[in-house]
From Swiss-Prot:
Residues 150-201 form the TSP type-1 domain. Glycans are attached at N129, N132, N346, N420, N550, N631, N1000, N1056. It comes from Mus musculus. Residues 1-21 form the signal peptide. PANTHER family: CARTILAGE INTERMEDIATE LAYER PROTEIN 1 (PTHR15031:SF3), CARTILAGE INTERMEDIATE LAYER PROTEIN CLIP (PTHR15031). This is Cartilage intermediate layer protein 1. Monomer. Interacts with TGFB1. It is found in: Secreted, Extracellular space, Extracellular matrix. Cleaved into 2 chains possibly by a furin-like protease upon or preceding secretion. The lineage of its organism: Eukaryota, Metazoa, Chordata, Craniata, Vertebrata.
Length: 1184
């Protein structure tokens, strides 16, 4: 007996020790709920407290009116705040966050004390959404606990016993500490106790129909027969599919035969039994047994292609103070849908049992050690995918969220404003780096913060800059703080043209998924406003006339706002050929004349079938278009971004050996046909890198995600072409059903990043970097024996430049520097930027890369050997930096794992450069604003653009009669607003463009500050505009319609000086009949580009790159030739060296100003004016 007691005691000690050990472990991982801050008693009492006995809760706001509406439901409030709400509230009160009662808003709302409050966007007036509401509840007296009782939540129910039936186990319960002070939370958050599970019993399964089977997990009906027919997405049969019965454990019942049919006896048609049907590469089918009294039943089902999970919502960057709460959200789709989410903090997996595999990660009572990088991994039976990495910043209670000291930011001054103090034409006005900061947040825990806070300028000082003969006012940033981010909108514009001759795709459709979102115009142009929640922009361009192959593109865009321009190149669809469905057909895949095909398609006889699965025996009209990577001019037509997702959820690149698009149709009815058992024969001699041969795979494109998915492997097979020649082919099998674009690709893991920056001029100043430039890289394969001459291209990528340049992914090799080489190009709004020259001058300081690493990279601009070739690209060898080499550790090539170092590299680090050809114009704003970055907008009465989401550009056309081109200036000042009258908004300079046909006539399209509301939207200001030609000029005439308008819209500006023209700018968008051109857009560059094109054309709806001097003119000046020795504004600027006060920056040579428009006969420079030819490649031009 004593021995038994000793054993029982030891067992209890062991079990209690286990419980305490689990308690300690779990207590360390439990997150505390954010404490609810006390509400002052004056706010806690309602106005009608004498008429409403009871006590009011605090105000709750757990939702915002995004999505379907605003939901302040009682059950959700209880979930977050527990016992802060009583069990049975008596009343409910709702107000907007602006403190307006819900009944006074005029909106349709719903509410009850037992259910809470809600407002639906679809029930409101058109164009109006619900306001953001906050609610509180009136509770019976004494039903709300005091603050002292809010240290701990109530215990949760006991968990189930951990032991199997008939055994002893442990069950636990938990509670949460609600206190703001950690010292009050010293007690246990989890406790456990021993438990005895239920005694094991006989089978307790009851069957409403049939009998229980021997395993006691299903009901069986011996006289019932289930028939099934399973088909593939294209209508064909699905042989070999497994049929499972879902019981306590899935049981395989049978497989489908060659015709996709199956029979299963003994199941019960009870309307409850569930079958699961699976087949490799397809999403499982779940079927509930039909309920019937018959002896048999037939089910039909069609597989849906399995799709790897795809991230549609990435966690957002957020900032919080210690003690606050935050939620990070991740969402993925797929077939089947992902059922598990894993969260990682600084690459360490967070405890899945704590966060329940949920897509929303909630962290309460944050501590500073929880700051860092977070990402999620979504998982399903079809695979896994990882989200983008986001940054969570956690600062101390007393820490400043932003650095109050602005960083240096140089602006360029006018030509007559040289500063002796800095010995340059630049002035430091300062700026605040725009980054997410920990600002004021409400109590709601949301995926997207209700208010996004950024560091921005909070205080400026007005300073005066001394220039030659006048003073120039400016506003300098002196303090930064955390404030609401400027509202922005992301826009993608572009032009869709053919790869071969530049023919536009007219009136084609643009799809995002299954939704048509835009349409191309007559010139192939399109504009798309990107939805706010878009993570990856995948667009499919469909030609209604079927001239071009449908093309899917993944287009980079700026999530922080502004417009990005893309040139979309499409392959012309091959002329169809006629095939006999009852014969074996061979179709070659190759487009290079004089070269063997890369591969062949072999379509055996009787392989074609209709969409319903019926075999097709007639004539087939077949169009197979092959994108041949041996022709470098086709690189820009590559579809998607050539990426796939591996089994671990990581995105990996592919190196292509050719893409082909297929279109099979019934010659008689044009009905689309499918083809099964198609073979692809890849000529192994076309694969120049031996290590790629065993890794070759066949892929198809998912048009919804823009990702490539594996179709199958290749195997070796020898074939004899003729009596003497025998070749080795890689043979792969495929079926052509719902997907029509295929790829011969190799996964490639040898990756690096190239650092590229783009500048406004050859001065290469950090403050003159351009954002929103599309930088593209073409990966090349070397020709055997000639490392400098490319054999074929293998991959095409594009990246958008940000405030710190861009990092382009490219293949690289650390053993052989010549294994890979690349071409790099850059364009802005369709205009190609120039690369730094490599011949006849080779200046490492100008290129941006020091020696000896630059020699190893073999930098060559495209005109290196032929000066007639365009200067808009450069080629380098992708030599991976050696880890122990100091000269290779600071860029411009970074190892793939060093992406963060590439993105955060300072301007002094090595990088490659592109620059704009300096045009003959100059802009100065009193309140500095970077047009590439709409988030740099500052609230100020003197802001040139008064509204951050509505940029209005105004131009006036000025005609100059005289032998020389003249610099024309607009000086823009406040005219009628009491806050700005007499104060300078800014100045604009532009040089007139000579007319092609009239030697003594030139014209200028001059920007001026539009009249209208200022930033406070209180009252309008008629801008006082002075148009001043810089020379010996006098006003000859004023457009009569413009003059009449100004006379009829007083006040009228005084014009006593005939050498200039003064007006109070019109409020109305007048048009070409007045010589005024006005365009409003959500992107400033787009507005200016469109308005400038109309001004050049002299119309209100057209566009031109050639100046038409005699149409749409507002002002005419007669200008005499300048005296000998007197310099123009731009000549003065050319003759003065541009020196920067910035230190630590690699400076290039200072070029002479290029007068592009004058030298090209009035042309506005665009990217398509001259062909770009690559060294050693005798193919068609890359840019058409």
């Amino acid at each position: 007996m004593a021995a038994i007691k000793t054993w029982v005691f030891s067992f209890l000690v062991l079990e209690v020790t286990t419980v305490l050990g689990r308690q300690t472990m779990l207590a360390q991982s439990v997150r505390r709920v954010q404490p609810v801050k006390r509400t002052p008693k004056t706010l806690a009492k309602p106005a009608d407290s004498q008429e409403s006995p009871g006590e009011w809760t605090t105000w709750f706001n757990i939702d915002h009116p995004g999505g379907q509406g605003d939901y302040e439901r009682l059950d959700a409030i209880r979930f977050y705040y527990g016992e802060r709400v009583c069990a049975r509230p008596l009343r409910l009160e709702a107000r907007t966050t602006d403190w307006m009662p819900a009944g006074s808003t005029g909106q349709v709302v719903h509410g009850s004390p037992r259910e809470g409050f809600w407002c639906l966007n679809r029930e409101q007036r058109p164009g109006q959404n619900c306001s953001n509401y906050t609610v509180r509840f009136l509770c019976p007296p004494g039903s709300l606990r005091g603050d002292a009782e809010h240290i701990w939540s109530s215990w949760s129910p006991w968990s189930k016993c951990s032991a199997a039936c008939g055994h002893t186990g442990v069950q636990t319960r938990t509670r949460t500490c609600l206190a703001q002070t950690v010292s009050l939370c010293s007690e246990a958050t989890e406790e456990g106790q021993l438990c005895m599970s239920q005694a094991c019993t006989a089978c307790d399964l009851t069957c409403p129909m049939g009998q229980v089977n021997a395993d006691c997990d299903a009901c069986m009906c011996q006289d019932f027969m289930l028939h099934g027919a399973i088909s593939l997405p294209g209508g064909g049969p699905a042989p070999g599919a497994a049929v499972y019965l879902l019981a306590k454990a899935p049981k395989m019942l049978t497989r489908t035969d060659s015709s996709g049919r199956f029979r299963v006896p003994g199941l019960c048609p009870d309307g409850k039994t569930i079958l699961k049907i699976t087949k490799t590469k397809f999403a499982p089918i779940m079927i509930t047994m039909p309920k019937t009294s018959l002896k048999s039943a037939t089910i039909n089902a069609e597989f849906v292609r399995a799709e790897t999970p795809y991230i549609v919502m990435n966690p957002e960057m957020k900032a919080r103070r210690a003690g606050q709460s935050v939620s990070l959200c991740c969402k993925a789709t797929g077939k089947p849908s992902p059922d598990k989410y894993f969260w990682y903090h600084n690459n360490t997996l967070l405890d899945p049992s704590l966060y329940k595999h949920e897509s929303k990660l909630v962290l309460r009572n944050l501590q500073q050690d929880q700051a860092g990088e977070y990402f999620c991994k979504a998982q399903s039976d079809a695979g896994a995918v990882k989200s983008k990495v986001t940054q969570l910043t956690v600062i101390a209670h007393d820490e400043t969220p932003c650095n109050p000291t602005p960083e240096s930011y140089l602006i360029r001054l006018p030509h007559d404003c040289f500063q002796n103090a800095s010995n340059s034409f630049y002035y430091d006005v300062g700026r605040c780096p725009i980054k997410t900061c920990a600002g004021q947040q409400d109590n709601g825990i949301r995926c997207r913060d209700a208010v996004e806070n950024c560091c921005g300028i909070s205080r400026t000082e007005e300073r005066e800059i001394q220039c030659s003969g006048y003073t120039l006012p400016t506003k300098v940033a002196v303090e930064c703080s955390c404030q609401r981010c400027a509202e922005t909108r992301s826009i993608v514009r572009g032009r869709v043209t053919a790869t071969d001759n530049g023919e536009p795709m007219r009136f084609g459709h643009v799809y995002m998924g299954n939704n048509r979102v835009s349409m191309t115009g007559y010139k192939g142009t399109f504009t798309l406003h990107i939805p706010q929640d878009t993570e990856r922009l995948v667009l499919t361009f469909v030609d209604r006339l079927q001239k071009f192959v449908n093309t899917t593109k993944v287009l980079p865009f700026n999530k922080k706002g502004s417009a990005v321009f893309h040139e979309i190149k499409m392959l012309r669809q091959k002329e169809p050929i006629t095939l006999e469905a009852m014969e074996t057909n061979i179709i070659p895949l190759g487009e290079v004349i004089g070269e063997d095909p890369v591969a062949e398609l072999e379509i055996p006889s009787k392989s074609f079938y209709r969409q319903n699965g019926e075999p097709f025996t007639g004539k087939v009209k077949a169009s197979v278009t092959f994108l041949d990577p041996r022709n470098i001019s086709t690189a820009t037509a590559a579809q998607s971004d050539l990426n796939f997702i591996n089994d671990e959820g990581d995105t990996f690149p592919l190196r292509t050996y050719g893409m082909f698009s297929v279109d099979f149709r019934d010659e008689a009815t044009s009905e689309s046909l499918n083809a099964g058992k198609v073979k692809v024969h890849l000529d192994s001699t076309q694969v120049k890198m031996p290590e790629h041969v065993p890794a070759m795979k066949l892929w198809s494109l998912n048009p919804d995600t823009g990702l490539w998915e594996e179709e199958g492997d290749f195997k070796f097979e020898s074939q004899r072409r003729n009596k003497r020649e025998e070749r080795t082919f890689l043979v792969g099998n495929m079926e052509i059903r719902e997907r029509r674009l295929f790829n011969l690709d190799v996964p490639e893991s040898r990756r690096c990043f190239i650092k590229v920056r783009t500048y406004r001029s050859e001065r290469f100043l950090p403050s003159e970097q351009i954002q929103g430039v599309v930088v593209s890289v073409i990966n090349l394969e070397p020709r055997t024996g000639f490392s400098s001459n490319p054999r074929a291209w293998g991959r095409f990528d594009s990246v958008i430049t940000g405030p710190n340049g861009a990092c382009l992914p490219a293949f690289c090799d650390d053993q052989s520097p010549d294994a890979y080489s690349v071409y790099v190009l850059a364009s802005l709004s369709g205009e190609e930027l120039e690369a730094v020259e490599s011949s006849p001058k080779f200046n490492p300081n100008a290129i941006g890369v020091p020696q000896p690493y630059l020699n190893k990279l073999k930098y060559r601009r495209t005109d290196h050997e032929d000066p007639r070739v365009k200067k808009t690209a450069f080629q380098i060898s992708m030599a991976k930096p050696r880890p122990n080499s100091a000269e290779e550790s600071n860029g411009p090539i970074y190892a793939f794992e060093n992406l963060r170092a590439c993105e955060e590299a300072p301007p002094s680090a090595a990088h490659f450069r592109f620059y704009q050809i300096e045009g003959d114009r100059y802009d100065y704003n009193t309140v500095p604003f970077n047009e590439d970055d709409p988030m740099s907008w500052t609230e100020d009465y003197l802001a040139w653009w008064p509204k951050p989401m509505e940029f209005r550009a105004c131009y006036i056309k000025v005609k100059i009669v005289g032998p020389l081109e003249v610099n024309v200036r607009s000086r823009n000042m406040g005219g009628t607003h009491r806050q700005t009258v007499g104060k300078l908004y800014g100045i604009r300079d532009v040089k007139s463009t000579r007319d092609r046909d009239q030697p003594n006539v030139s014209s200028a399209c001059l920007e001026f500050k539009c009249s209208g509301m200022l930033y406070d939207q209180d009252r309008v200001d008629r801008t006082l505009v002075k148009v001043i030609p810089q020379g010996s000029c006098h006003r000859a005439s004023v457009n009569s319609m413009l003059h009449e308008y100004l006379v009829n819209h007083l006040p009228l500006a005084v014009n006593n000086d005939t050498s200039e023209y003064t007006m109070l700018a019109p409020l109305d968008p007048l048009g070409h009949n007045y010589g005024i051109y006005t365009v409003t857009d959500q992107d400033p560059r787009t507005a200016k580009e469109i308005a400038l094109g109309r001004c050049f054309d002299g119309t209100s709806d057209g566009s031109s790159r050639i100046m038409k001097s005699n149409v749409g003119v507002a002002l005419t000046f007669n200008c005499a030739e300048r005296q000998v020795g007197r310099q123009s504004a731009f000549q003065y600027l050319q003759s003065t060296p541009a020196r920067s006060p910035a230190t630590g920056t690699v400076q290039g040579r200072v070029p002479a100003m290029r007068q592009q428009r004058a030298s090209r006969g009035g042309l506005r420079r665009r990217g398509s004016m001259a062909p770009l030819r690559f060294s050693g490649v005798a193919q068609q031009p890359l840019s058409n």
